[in-house]
Design a protein with these regions (language model features):
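Hinge/capping helix and adjacent helix->loop/strand transition within the periplasmic-binding protein
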Residues: 98-105, 119-207, 256, 269-302
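A ligand-binding cleft/hinge motif common to bilobed small-molecule-binding domains
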Residues: 113-123, 182, 186-191, 219-253
Length: 341
């Protein structure tokens, strides 16, 4: 009798809880429907595009090009460009990492602030892999080794061999300590035996180029866009490009890969990222739209005029690039014992 009564009590209790279960189920279904509606109607309000550097320059130009051309592909939504410079790009990037992952806050990331700075700067709070959702890599900005005419070497092998005759005699200038160009130089030193001395210039590429042309340093790692004009007119020597293929602006300058030196590929790049947790359907839609922009002949011409090489690709490909570069630069910083004060 007791057993039967107990079962009856359990059934009665279960029946009483049915309205609550039904309400919870309806709430879940309603939330799911709203989420699907949000994705289907995306975007239905302005999109913020954070640019972690000031107005002007190639990066800002890319942001404005993307905003103009993405708009008609995204329900004619307003895309607001917000320049947030400071701390080597960390201010704008940190803001993106803390933003709501709803597709309405994006970042024009560059390799320096996303995958290089976190390997060096302890105060940075974001993690390049955990805190962001890659959308699309947009462009490469190839970097290269360029030398003063006083350097006798005329190709990559001769350049490396010459550095070993008097280790440290060849100096290489870059735009500072701990950027992609500096780390590329350390990568060449550790993996190819390049025996040279780093000379950082906090004042930027123009001063580095001026001192190289004047013979105050005898080589440098610079962007192809900065070094290209003096190479073309014969005032400087193009030694090698760090990309996996030759630069469009300097097709006669070989890659290090062509010289049999693998594993040192490096370039600066720009790409779109969102906060981690952004719904994949939104990410895929943004990736498709971004790729359409950088495949457009007019957009390609404008980008190439800035010495930028469009790099259309998938979300997963960009994700793999971020992960591999963060791992690579972390190891280079450790091996070279690079410190940023």
């Amino acid at each position: 009798m007791f057993k039967t009564k107990g079962n009856a009590m359990k059934i009665s209790s279960s029946l009483k809880s049915l309205p609550y279960l039904a309400a919870a189920l309806l709430a879940c279904l309603s939330a799911g429907t709203h989420a699907q509606d949000d994705i289907a109607n995306y975007p239905n309000k302005p999109i913020r595009l954070i640019v972690p550097f000031g107005p002007g320059g190639a990066g800002d130009a890319v942001a404005r090009l993307m905003a103009d051309r993405l708009r008609p592909m995204l329900n004619n939504a307003t895309i607001l460009i917000e320049n947030k410079p400071g701390a080597g790009g960390a201010i704008g990037t940190t803001e993106l990492a803390r933003a709501k992952p709803d597709g309405y806050t994006l970042l024009l990331a560059f390799d320096g602030n996303l995958v290089v700075s976190p390997t060096l700067v302890k105060s940075i709070t974001f993690h390049p892999v955990r805190d962001f959702q890659p959308i699309a890599k947009l462009v490469n900005l190839p970097i290269m080794v360029v030398a003063h005419p006083s350097v006798k070497a005329n190709n990559i092998k001769e350049f490396i061999d010459q550095s070993k005759v008097k280790p440290g005699d060849i100096t290489y200038g870059t735009t500072g300590v701990g950027n992609t160009m500096h780390l590329a130089g350390e990568l060449l030193r550790t993996r190819a035996g390049m025996a040279w001395t780093h000379v950082p210039y906090a004042s930027g590429g123009a001063k580095t180029l001026t001192d190289l042309a004047g013979g105050f340093i005898n080589s440098a790692i610079l962007s192809v866009s900065v070094a290209g004009p003096m190479i073309r007119d014969g005032r400087l020597k193009g030694i090698g490009v760090f990309s996996d293929k030759r630069a469009l602006l300097l097709p006669d300058v070989p890659t290090f890969q062509e010289a049999g030196i693998g594993g040192i590929e490096a370039s600066s790049w720009l790409g779109l990222v969102a906060p981690a947790g952004t719904p994949r359907p939104l990410v895929d839609r943004l990736n498709k739209a971004a790729n359409e922009v950088i495949r457009n002949p007019e957009a390609v011409a404008r980008l190439q005029a800035l010495a930028l090489e469009p790099t259309p690709g998938s979300v997963d490909e960009f994700d793999a690039i971020i992960k591999s570069e963060f791992a690579k630069w972390t190891q280079v910083v450790k091996d070279a014992n690079i410190k940023v004060e």
